[in-house]
Design a protein with these regions (language model features):
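N-terminal cap/leader regions of alpha/beta-hydrolase-fold enzymes
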Residues: 1-157
């Protein structure tokens, strides 16, 4: 609904991204200390979570970072030289939140990177991988999820 969307944008505007990364760091510490885990970690995020995954891949000791239609990555490129592990970023061709100019800027910034892969999905919009969402695109979601799972398998095993 429009009310829910407006509330979501209000909360988004108030969100402290660095505190979000700190929360992820705390979660990762707990996972690494838990004897029932392998100690390997990855961060996967969608929308704002895509930005958090990007920043986690830059600032934290993780084995992989994956972002779907991450908003605001272009404003945080000063961290890109800190990437030490594989990162995959998925974008939608028709995404007004991550427009063509932004995707081009990201492609230019990561074109020579062996660690960062960018994937653009033609004819798709923001939220294309969210099952049940208005912009859900089954084919693109399956392709992006297959790519994501392959990176996770390679990085975490």
């Amino acid at each position: 609904s429009e009310i829910a969307t407006n509330k979501a944008f209000e909360l988004y505007q108030k969100f402290d991204v660095e505190k979000g990364v700190d929360d992820i760091a705390a979660s990762l510490r707990w996972l690494r200390e838990n004897e029932n885990t392998s100690g390997k970690t990855a961060v996967v995020g969608y929308c704002l979570g895509g930005l958090l995954a990007f920043l986690s891949g830059c600032q934290l000791d993780i084995d992989a970072a994956i972002g779907y239609y991450g908003v605001g990555i272009e404003k945080n490129l000063q961290h890109k030289n800190m990437i030490r592990k594989p990162m995959m970023l998925h974008f939608a061709e028709n995404d007004a939140f991550v427009p063509a100019e932004t995707r081009k800027e990201l492609e230019e910034n990561f074109s020579d990177s062996d660690l960062v892969s960018l994937h653009n999905y033609k004819g798709c919009d923001h939220g294309f991988a969210r099952t049940g969402g208005g912009n859900y695109d089954k084919a693109a979601a399956e392709i992006s999820d297959t790519r994501t799972l392959a990176l996770l398998k390679k990085s975490l095993t």
